[in-house]
C-alpha cells in the first residue's frame, strides 16, 4: 500500500506543472518590478543630487519666491523648478542602462550559485586548457613529444607512459605518432613490435636493426655475449624463467639453477655460441646428469646446484624430469637461434649505437618465442639501468601489446629508478586483467609508477574501475534546489542549499562510451 501511495504521489499531475510555471511567472515579474523600482528611485535620487550640486543658487531663489506674497512669482518658480527637474531627469536617464546590467548580474549570480564548484582533488579540463597549463612552464617548445595537441614536458618522458584501451580504439595510432616524432628527434628507441605494424612503416636499413630469429635481416645475438660476471648468469636466468606463484616456486628455482649451470659451463669452456646453448639445453635427463658431473669435475662450482636436482634420476626419481621439463618451457626458443652467430652486443649498442632496434614477434610462434623476446628486452633494460647517471640521456622502450611478453624482472625497477639513466618506458595493453594476470600484485605498482596515463575505450569492468580510481576523485560544492508547493501562494517557495560532495572525476561506465581515437 505504501508503495502504491508513493507511486501515486510521484505521478505527473497537471497541477504540478502549473505550480512550477506559475511560480516562475511570479518570480520573473517580481524580479522585473523590483529592478524597475530600484532603477527609478536611483534615477530620482541622481536628479535631485545634480540639481542640488549645479543649481543650488537657483533653488535658493525658488524657495525665496515661495516666501513672498506674490502669486505670479510662485507660478514662475514652479515652472522653473519643473523645467530644471525635467532637464536633469533627462540628463540622468542613462542610469536606465543599469536595468539590463542588473539582469545580467542576476544571471551570473544564478549560474554561480547553481553551478557545482570544484574545491580540491582531480579536475577535468579541456585539451586546450591542459595545453596552456603545460606550455606556461615550458622554456623550450621545439622537439617535444606531443599527444594530440598536448606537449609532453621533457621531465615527464622519463616518468613513463601507460596506454590502455580495447582493440581498435587508437593505441597503435598513438604509438605511430610517438615513433614518428622520435624518428625526427633521432632518438635511440627499442620497439617491441608484436604484430609487425611498425617495422613495415618505420624500418630504415641504413640505421635500424631487427631482432627476430626467423627474419633473415636479424642481428646475430647470443645471450652468452651479455655475461661479464657471475651475477650476470643469475640475472639472465631470472629474465628467461620468471618468478611464478608460491606453489611452483621450487620448480622455477630448480630450472633457473640448471640453466645458470649451463650458462656458466659454456662461458667457462669458451663454448659461447647459440649452437652450443641449444645443444646443452636440449640434452636428455641422463645426458644432462653426466654433463653436470663433468662440469663439477672441471671446477664449475655452480653446477653442484643443478647436480642436486638431477642425481635422483638414476634411482627413478621424477624430480629431474620435472625440473628439466620446467626449464624447457623457456629454453625451447633457443632452437630458433641455433643458427645465429655471436656478433651483436646489446650493451655496446646501448652505449654507442643509434637508430631503432625493432624486436619483432611472430604470432604463429607466440608462445615459443615469448621467452626469447622477453629475455632480450629484460636484458636490454638491465643494461640501460647499469649505464652511468645521465638524466638528459634518452633511451625509449616502446612495448606495444605489453601483455604478450612474459613477466619482465627488471620492469618495475626500471619504472622506479630509470629516470636518472634517461630511460623512458611506453607500455601499451588492452585491459588491466592482462597485466594483473602476469604481474599479480605488482600490476598496481607498474601503473602507479607511470605518470602519463592514457586510456582509450574499455569494455572490461575491472579495467574501467581501476582507471576510474587512477584518475582520482574531487570534492565538489554543489547546490540543491527545493521547490515547495501549497494551495496558498504564501506556501510556495524556492530554497537553495549548498553542500560538499565527493565524486569520481570519471565514472567507470564513461570509459565504455569513448569513441575510437578518443582518450
Predicted features and spans:
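Short gly/ser/thr-rich secondary-structure transition/capping motifs
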Residues: 143-148, 340-341, 437
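Conserved ATP-driven motor cores of ASCE-family P-loop NTPases powering translocation/secretion/packaging/pilus
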Residues: 227-231, 415-519
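P-loop NTPase motor domains
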Residues: 2-4, 36, 154-157, 161-423, ...
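Glycine-centered flexibility motif
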Residues: 148, 187, 212, 270, ...
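Accessory regions of macromolecular translocation/handling assemblies
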Residues: 1-190, 199-206, 268-269, 294-298, ...
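Generic beta-strand/beta-sheet core signal
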Residues: 115-121, 125-127, 164, 192, ...
Amino acid at each position: 500500500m505504501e508503495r502504491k501511495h508513493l507511486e501515486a504521489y510521484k505521478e505527473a499531475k497537471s497541477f504540478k506543472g502549473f505550480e512550477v510555471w506559475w511560480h516562475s511567472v511570479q518570480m520573473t515579474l517580481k524580479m522585473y518590478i523590483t529592478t524597475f523600482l530600484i532603477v527609478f528611485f536611483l534615477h530620482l535620487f541622481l536628479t535631485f543630487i545634480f540639481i542640488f550640486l549645479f543649481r543650488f543658487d537657483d533653488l535658493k531663489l525658488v524657495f525665496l519666491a515661495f516666501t513672498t506674497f506674490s502669486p505670479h512669482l510662485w507660478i514662475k518658480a514652479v515652472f522653473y523648478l519643473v523645467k530644471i527637474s525635467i532637464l536633469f531627469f533627462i540628463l540622468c536617464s542613462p542610469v536606465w542602462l543599469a536595468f539590463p546590467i542588473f539582469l545580467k548580474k542576476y544571471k551570473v549570480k544564478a549560474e554561480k550559485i547553481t553551478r557545482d564548484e570544484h574545491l580540491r582533488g582531480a579536475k577535468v579540463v579541456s585539451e586546450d586548457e591542459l595545453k596552456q597549463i603545460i606550455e606556461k612552464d615550458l622554456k623550450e617548445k621545439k622537439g617535444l613529444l606531443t599527444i594530440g595537441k598536448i606537449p609532453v614536458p621533457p621531465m615527464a618522458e622519463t616518468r613513463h607512459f601507460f596506454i590502455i584501451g580495447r582493440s581498435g580504439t587508437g593505441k597503435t595510432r598513438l604509438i605511430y605518432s610517438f615513433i614518428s616524432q622520435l624518428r625526427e628527434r633521432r632518438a635511440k628507441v627499442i620497439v617491441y613490435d608484436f604484430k609487425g605494424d611498425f617495422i613495415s612503416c618505420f624500418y630504415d636499413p641504413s640505421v635500424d636493426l631487427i631482432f627476430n630469429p626467423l627474419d633473415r635481416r636479424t642481428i646475430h645475438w647470443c645471450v652468452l655475449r651479455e655475461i661479464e660476471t657471475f651475477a650476470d648468469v643469475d640475472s639472465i636466468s631470472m629474465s628467461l624463467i620468471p618468478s611464478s606463484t608460491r606453489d611452483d616456486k621450487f620448480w622455477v628455482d630448480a630450472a633457473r639453477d640448471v640453466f645458470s649451470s649451463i650458462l656458466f659451463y659454456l662461458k667457462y669452456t669458451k663454448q659461447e655460441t647459440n649452437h652450443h646453448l641449444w645443444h646443452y639445453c636440449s640434452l636428455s635427463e641422463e645426458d644432462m646428469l653426466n654433463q653436470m658431473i663433468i662440469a663439477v669435475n672441471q671446477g664449475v662450482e655452480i653446477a653442484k646446484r643443478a647436480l642436486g636436482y638431477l642425481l635422483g634420476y638414476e634411482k627413478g626419481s621424477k624430480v629431474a624430469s620435472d625440473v628439466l621439463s620446467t626449464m624447457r618451457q623457456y629454453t625451447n626458443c633457443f632452437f630458433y637461434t641455433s643458427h645465429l652467430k655471436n656478433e651483436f652486443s646489446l650493451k655496446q649498442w646501448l652505449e654507442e649505437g643509434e637508430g631503432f632496434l625493432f624486436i619483432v614477434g611472430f604470432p604463429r610462434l607466440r608462445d615459443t618465442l615469448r621467452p626469447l623476446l622477453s629475455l632480450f628486452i629484460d636484458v636490454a633494460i638491465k643494461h640501460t639501468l647499469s649505464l652511468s647517471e645521465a638524466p638528459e640521456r634518452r633511451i625509449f622502450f616502446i612495448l606495444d601489446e605489453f601483455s604478450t611478453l612474459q613477466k619482465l624482472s627488471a620492469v618495475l625497477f626500471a619504472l622506479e629508478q630509470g629516470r636518472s639513466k634517461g630511460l623512458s618506458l611506453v607500455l601499451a595493453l588492452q585491459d588491466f586483467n592482462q597485466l594483473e594476470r602476469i604481474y599479480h600484485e605488482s600490476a598496481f605498482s607498474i601503473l602507479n609508477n607511470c605518470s602519463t596515463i592514457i586510456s582509450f575505450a574499455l569494455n572490461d569492468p575491472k579495467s574501467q574501475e581501476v582507471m576510474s580510481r587512477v584518475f582520482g576523485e574531487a570534492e565538489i560544492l554543489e547546490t540543491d534546489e527545493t521547490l515547495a508547493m501549497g494551495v496558498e501562494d504564501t506556501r510556495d517557495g524556492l530554497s537553495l542549499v549548498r553542500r560538499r560532495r565527493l565524486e569520481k572525476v570519471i565514472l567507470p561506465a564513461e570509459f565504455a562510451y569513448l569513441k575510437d581515437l578518443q582518450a
